């Protein structure tokens, strides 16, 4: 749920299929975003109430959230605004996976996404996206163990994202404990992202 300066409107949630709280991303854990001006098209500028063509930076964390208690309040607010009709997802970058999943469980999401370093972003510092992060294969096992230890397997879904490129990657993620996978970059490239089709 973005800041109001990025055009967030709680009424839009009534139209949503789900609400994802973006806590982190595997290829830039703990860092904010950097959206290059060339990607701030007129359409993006209008949607986010930003000037077109100007670089945009986003903070590493939402300024309204200081910890899991604040996030739990926001999740409850979203559930109330949607009469509990849309699933709540938390997206975590693979860092301190076991501890982060245990903390995320306290916010009562429907699913937790673990994003490994193999994923990509169009809004991160080059050094971070190329040289940092935890491989997703290791992250899946840690996340599953955290859910198992808390007795939350089957109650909170574990979704893996980050570098899924083919059926073999899907099979490995499921075998290691993911309930589902999410594909971002690969599907965007298949659709010729950011270009007229």
Where are these regions (language model features)?
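Acidic (Asp/Glu)-rich catalytic clusters
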Residues: 11-16, 105-106
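Mobile "lid/hinge" segments at catalytic clefts and subdomain interfaces of large enzymes
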Residues: 15-52, 177, 187-189, 195
């Amino acid at each position: 749920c973005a800041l109001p300066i990025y055009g967030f409107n709680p009424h839009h949630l009534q139209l949503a299929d789900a609400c994802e709280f973006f806590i982190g991303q595997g290829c830039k854990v703990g860092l904010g975003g950097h959206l290059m001006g060339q990607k701030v098209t007129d359409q993006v500028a209008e949607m986010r109430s930003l000037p077109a063509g100007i670089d945009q930076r986003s903070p590493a964390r939402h300024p309204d959230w200081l910890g899991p208690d604040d996030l739990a309040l926001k999740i409850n607010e979203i559930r109330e605004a949607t009469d509990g009709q849309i699933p709540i997802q938390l997206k975590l970058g693979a860092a301190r996976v076991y501890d982060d999943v245990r903390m995320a469980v306290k916010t009562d999401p429907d699913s937790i996404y673990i994003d490994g370093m193999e994923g990509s972003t169009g809004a991160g510092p080059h050094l971070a996206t190329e040289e940092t992060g935890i491989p997703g294969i290791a992250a899946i096992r840690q996340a599953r163990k955290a859910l198992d230890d808390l007795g939350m397997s089957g109650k909170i879904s574990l979704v893996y994202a980050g570098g899924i490129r083919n059926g073999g990657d899907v099979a490995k993620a499921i075998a290691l404990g993911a309930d589902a996978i999410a594909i971002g970059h690969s599907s965007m490239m298949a659709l010729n992202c950011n270009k007229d089709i």
